[in-house]
């Protein structure tokens, strides 16, 4: 046994002598998106800081035509290649098969039905519907107009799961509380068209929604929320948080946006109610760790949700004082039910149509 342990330690030391060069290829949003590109890069930086002998580089994709040259460049010059975003799925699969001696990690990338995943490719996706469910329940609990909004970029699976989950949360609230909160939905057709995103957000607010969950450029929806909200409160755009909170309680209502994929509450304190949290940083770190230490790469499709803390919502650092304690307690209770497998969140329209939570008894 001692000889085996010595051999294992020697192997790890041998591997660490050479380390790994990790090259991340962004989606078209690039760094600074305050979303999954930034989150994945944070996971890479965490690996650089916490794991031995990791060198990191990043290649920025400005548009989808950059995927092939960037991923090819990364495969030729790196030991581990991380591709970010659903839109580069086909390219990542093709490049991974061309470079079998390189490890590939796909973040927010899932295989097609019956698609064989190469042994050098690890895919990480998330149960966005679970985070969306909690956000929908919170929005329905907080709305003063009985209307909430959802804005997506492109109708791709991760965004649709967010939408379905969000609407499921609203439906759960309606069934449990006997209310009739409705959801206004809209899609931009792009993840980068800030002007159209803001236009849709203003339209949602104009049609009565007072809370919007955005699965697209959050900054544009925040601009809309601040524009409408500051006018309603009679405050300047740069009003401090304490004044926003005072006016919220004075007026008895306000205008909010819900961020996505990362904790975006800090971007506009008092206007960002909360954010979904997709642990893309953890996925990137675990993929790199697997390549470094195991050399038995943990390939395949890994789906992370609330049960394994891959999804969640932000702690509402700036707005928790606006949210009744009863609502906070209900969110914690519902999250526990999901962790325990006692409630399954719909992933598509058919499942949403038959969604029934009347059996859920909130014990307070």
Regions found by a protein language model. Name each.
Residues 4-13, 17:
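Sec-dependent N-terminal signal peptides
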Residues 20-364:
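A residue-level marker of the well-folded mature domains of exported/periplasmic proteins
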């Amino acid at each position: 046994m001692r000889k085996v342990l010595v051999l294992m330690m020697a192997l790890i030391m041998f591997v660490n002598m050479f380390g790994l060069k990790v090259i991340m290829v962004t989606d078209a949003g690039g760094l600074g998106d305050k979303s999954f590109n930034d989150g994945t890069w944070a996971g890479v930086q965490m690996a650089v800081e916490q794991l031995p002998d990791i060198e990191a580089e990043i290649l920025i994709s400005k548009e989808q035509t950059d995927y092939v040259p960037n991923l090819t460049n990364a495969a030729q010059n790196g030991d581990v290649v991380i591709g970010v975003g659903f839109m580069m799925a086909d390219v990542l699969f093709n490049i991974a098969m061309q470079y079998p001696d390189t490890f590939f990690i796909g973040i927010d990338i899932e295989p097609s039905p019956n698609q064989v995943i190469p042994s050098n490719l690890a895919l990480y996706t998330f149960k966005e519907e679970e985070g969306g469910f909690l956000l929908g329940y919170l929005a329905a609990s907080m709305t003063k107009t009985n209307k909430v909004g959802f804005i997506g970029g492109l109708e791709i699976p991760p965004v649709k799961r967010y939408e379905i989950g969000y609407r499921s949360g609203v439906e759960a609230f309606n069934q449990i509380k006997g209310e009739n909160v409705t959801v206004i939905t809209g899609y931009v057709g792009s993840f980068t068209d800030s002007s159209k995103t803001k236009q849709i957000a203003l339209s949602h607010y104009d049609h009565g929604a007072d809370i919007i969950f955005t699965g697209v450029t959050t900054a544009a929806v925040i601009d809309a929320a601040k524009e409408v909200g500051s006018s309603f409160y009679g405050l300047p755009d740069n009003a401090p948080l304490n004044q926003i909170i005072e006016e919220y309680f004075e007026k008895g209502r306000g205008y909010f946006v819900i961020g996505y994929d990362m904790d975006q509450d800090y971007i506009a304190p008092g206007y960002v109610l909360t954010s979904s949290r997709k642990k893309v940083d953890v996925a990137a770190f675990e993929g790199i760790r697997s390549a470094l230490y195991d050399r038995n790469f943990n390939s395949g499709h890994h789906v992370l949700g609330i049960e394994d803390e891959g999804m969640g919502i932000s702690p509402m650092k700036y707005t928790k004082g606006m949210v009744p304690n009863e609502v906070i307690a209900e969110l914690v209770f519902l999250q526990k039910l999901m962790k325990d497998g006692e409630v399954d969140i719909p992933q598509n329209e058919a499942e949403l149509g038959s969604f029934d939570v009347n059996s859920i008894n909130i014990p307070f």
